[in-house]
Each structure stands twice: as structure tokens, then as C-alpha cells.
């Protein structure tokens, strides 16, 4: 029976008996259920419940680590571990009721395994009885927001109770999910490099102004394109490590509750097709006028392709409504943002800008790039991914159109469709064990066959020994306990969790500060992935 159902049954019994004290005694369980709706014991791969039988007798400690083994991007932004620590591991992670529920699914012939000799509930009972349900685990990690080149250790995990050596890698399943916010934050940051590059090349703004404006260039449109609210929360917050624009409001809850920050992703009033088509094709211009009148100041966006984006730009925005648009305050932050939403993104934008420049005029900045009047801009939110953004900017560059005229909305390609665990080849592996008091290195080094039939060593080779992440002039490197100077080397991995207690929390502002794109990174910006 789940913890939630157990609580409900006990509350019903207490109410029937008029036993108020019994209800008060349930408060710890109620708080656990509210904080932890998922049973941690069930948050692992089925095969892991058998591992206690495979470890050699006398196994006292297992030391494992997380790394990106290399992938699409050369660096990763470490972000999101604090989410999983707070939501799954902190405090009382396992209760007696959790163990009972897990046994219902795993413990006997009617369970997952169809046998009663796989799941050993005494392993979990021991944690409840000996440690009060707190996990005897130590985790050290690089500070969140740190940009680390791939093929380096990002966190280590080991058990602190020799009777719980099996627990280290049992937690792999839930902790490895950190690949998701890391990869979203990394992708978002790579887009940011491209945006900064073109702002520096095509605008007249100084560095501080570019830093501010770029915050609003890539907007998260991804909520509807992900598989769950949890994905929207975690992935949406990862995007906000780099940018400020977002329609994924739920991401702010993570920032507030997990990262102790009042930072908010910024959104703007905007229409959708249900609004623009509500009066039919003939009434589209009326809805456009209404959009301008409802929000005469500030930013307002209007989807304009319900029937004909080119007519909308030439006859409506650039014709009958032109003077109303230009009557908006000329100060930044008061523009109408025209949104095409169909067709080839680059070719559509090329024609849209041609029409808008013709109807509204433009100025030419000191670098020779065209700039629309401050009252009107364009957003592209359809068909947007890192490659199409680079392609669009390259086209605008050729056409001498300044990057400041355009912002982007990126949906499923930001939070789901273009990323998975193998985007950066994330893995958690054991690297060191202690058996009967003796430390041993652990390593995997597969031999594989490539597409040409050649036998080669796999990129999946793991690291061995106890690990440290060391900062160098070129970034970071991982050293092992076999390397000379290991004991004296400064480890960038800091203790963040031990025995149920979070030892170090990062604020969202600290995370964003560490993830800032550095000037030296802009010397060569990759645009094709």
C-alpha cells in the first residue's frame, strides 16, 4: 500500500474513533507524502534490486561518478542536481510504509520478478531502523552553473555505511536524470553564444547593453512539447540559467523553491490563432487593432499568419495600422512583435523583413545594418532549433539586417525533441570499491566492432580509482588516485550531501553567474551541429 493510501486509511480510522492525537502523530508521514509523492525505493531499474546478491562478500564501499563522455557540445553546464537532492534524497527518504509498498510490487511470486528471492526488504528496513530513513550516502559535486569540458567527472557518490555499499549504484537511476537539466542548460547556452556573436557583429550596442538585450532573444515555448510537468519545470528552469524570456511559467517554481530565488522568467502579452481567427478572415484586422489598443505600451506579440502573413505585414500592419503602431512610445520595450508561424523560417523572414522595411522604413547603423523603427520587431517561433537559428542569422547578415530586429521562441527542440541522454553521452559508473578493508580500482573498457568490421576500444571506457576534478588554465581535467599529486590537488568537487543532509545549496543567481558566456568563448563559435 502506498504511503498516501496508508495515511488516508489511518486518518479515516482516527476520525471514526475520534482520536485527534492519532491524527497529530501522522503529521511526519503527511509531510513526507506532500514533499515526496514518489516512493524512492521504486525509483530504480528493476535489475538493480538483485545487485545485493552479486557484490562480493565483504564489499564495504562503492564509489561512483557522473560524467559526460563527450557528445554534440564540447562543454556542459552542470545544473539540476540540487533539484533531485531536495525532491528525492534530503531528509527522511525512506519510511517503513515505503518498504511495505515496495514489497507489494517486488517481494513475492505475484510481484515484478515472479519470485521471492530477488528483492531483499531487510536492506531498506535497515536504513529505516538504523538511519531513521535518511540515506547513508555522500555526494561531492562541482558547483552548479559551472561550465565543464566533457569527459570529466561532475559528481561522485559513495556510501557512508559499509552495510549499504549496494545503495550507491541503486541511486543511479534517479540521479542520472540530471542529464536532462544539464543538457537543456548546455543547449540553451550554445544558442546564446550564437546570439551574442551576431549582436556583436551587427549592432551598435556596447557590451553591457548586448548582455541585457540578449537575455530576451531566446524564449522558451516548450511546455506543450514535453512529456510531463516535471520536464517543463526542470527543463524550463535550465533554460533560464542562460536567458530570461520564457512562457514556461512553472519553471519559476523550481527557481523559487529549490534555488531560493525570486528570479522570474519574463513573458509578454501575446495572441494565438484562436483569437486572431475568432471573427473570420475579414475580421483579422479588427483583432490586430484590438491587440494594439489593449496594450498601447509595453511589448505585445501578435501571431499574424492565420490567413496570409505577407498580406498582414503589407496591408494591415504596414498599411491601415501603421500609424497606430508608430504612435507607440519610441523607447525600447514598447514594440509590437509580429509573429509568422508557418513556412520555411529563413525564406519567410526574408520576405517579412523586406515588406516591413518597405512599409515602416529603417535606419542604418554604423556597421551598415538595417534597423526597424523601435515600435516594431519580429519573433520567429516555428521551426526553431540551434541550426535554424544560426542559418537565419547568417541570412540576415548577408542581407545586412541587424540581429536586434528579431527574437526567437524555441519549443520542443529546446526541452525535448533534440535532446536525450546520449546528446552528451551521460553515464554513471563505479570507479573504486573497498572489499574487506582493501581498496580496489574499478573500470570498464569494452572492445567493440565499428561499422567497417574493425575491432576498436570503445569510447565507453570508464574512469578508475577515486576521482578529483582539477581546474587548469585550459578548463578542467580529471585526475585519479593513481596519479602523482592526487592527495595534494585541489578538488573542484565540493561536498553537497551527506547522510540525508544537504551541505551546500546554490542560489539561482549564483548558478547564472557561473554560466555566463566568457569573451574568450566567442573567438570561435560553432554554428552547425
Regions of interest found by a model, annotated:
Residues 63-130:
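N-terminal, Lys/Arg-enriched amphipathic/low-complexity engagement segments
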Residues 118, 189, 525-529:
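Short glycine-rich, low-complexity/disordered patches
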Residues 27-73, 110, 122-136, 140, ...:
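Buried, small/hydrophobic-residue-enriched core segments of structured protein domains
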Residues 13-23:
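Charged, low-complexity interaction regions
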